[in-house]
């Protein structure tokens, strides 16, 4: 099977579609699927178009959805926080995503926050897309996840491998979605190459390959390849790019 892997689109549908076109996803006549490594929305302004695209791929059984930390934030916004416009929901872009998907007026959303939350719960994103998301997906040689697989973070900022990560509970997966895979991979001992997103790849190129800076003119947002890891988050809001990895396995 051929897999087209994309991560952290964050609502930049046009850039995502361009990356898929360049990789040959739409013209591919062989068996293939799209793998989305989470963080679908919360930056760009094309949430509705992207939502429709995902629903179409789901209907055709051509997409595998991995849950990211921003999906967790959306659920938190519309359930625990009842649609309240807390500052971190705004700074993370989650509040704006809910506004886009519901069509709510920003002023009315802040006043009628319970109605706003109910409207967000009635979106296909909340009712259909998020419930279809997996913590991870694996093939013979690869495991696909958002941040990293559940591990034990140590005080020195290293990570200790957990052999039973597949049996991890909800809390462990929620935590792992926030991990920087490029740091976690330095101590991981898994037999599969882990393909992840969440953290901008310029970090790995800069810190571990000593190539360019994280956010300067010389920053490299291409996929990062290291022992046991392929990281693909291009930090689209900053770079304007979306990485598309093509894997056959």
Show where each model-derived region lies.
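N-terminal active-site segment of His-dependent metallophosphoesterases
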Residues: 1-53
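Residue-level marker for buried hydrophobic side chains located in beta-strands
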Residues: 5, 34-36, 65-66, 143, ...
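Divalent metal-coordination and catalytic microenvironments
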Residues: 8, 39, 68-69, 97, ...
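Short, glycine/acidic-enriched loop or turn micro-motifs at the edges of active sites
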Residues: 10-11, 42, 71-72, 149, ...
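A general structural motif
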Residues: 29-31, 60-62, 140, 189-191
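Conserved beta-strand scaffold positions in the cores of enzyme catalytic domains, especially
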Residues: 43, 65, 194, 229-233, ...
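Active-site neighborhood of divalent metal-dependent phosphoester bond hydrolases
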Residues: 43-135
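Acidic, His/Gly-enriched loop-helix segments that form or flank divalent-metal centers
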Residues: 107-230, 236-240
